[in-house]
């Protein structure tokens, strides 16, 4: 968010932060859905439903037809295509949010993130992905095992670095 009295690099850094935050929110949330399918936390049907819910029926059908036309038979490849479609859609939504709120952004009165200002269909689908991520993905055994491994690696590295620094 732009802050009154800021100019030049300071203003650019705040705007850049908002753009990076939107990209981060989009990629991590949608990639978590894709990864949960690969880890078999979510079924293909659940994953397809979540990803296609970002689009109206007409676009959903076009995506399904494109998957057929491209002869994608592997479920993971289908999910990759749907994930890429969702990320592209959300990028365009954030651009639209930026353009719709450009005056507020420049005046320093813009509130929230770009994700907060996307269209209702996409916002509802995004919130559903967040809900599923918290209820099913982040609490699942495979994800917790990976997280625990990461903590163990960090603890080992800290011990090695501290030992090296002390000696």
State where each predicted segment sits.
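Histidine-centered, transition-metal-coordinating active-site segments
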Residues: 1-167
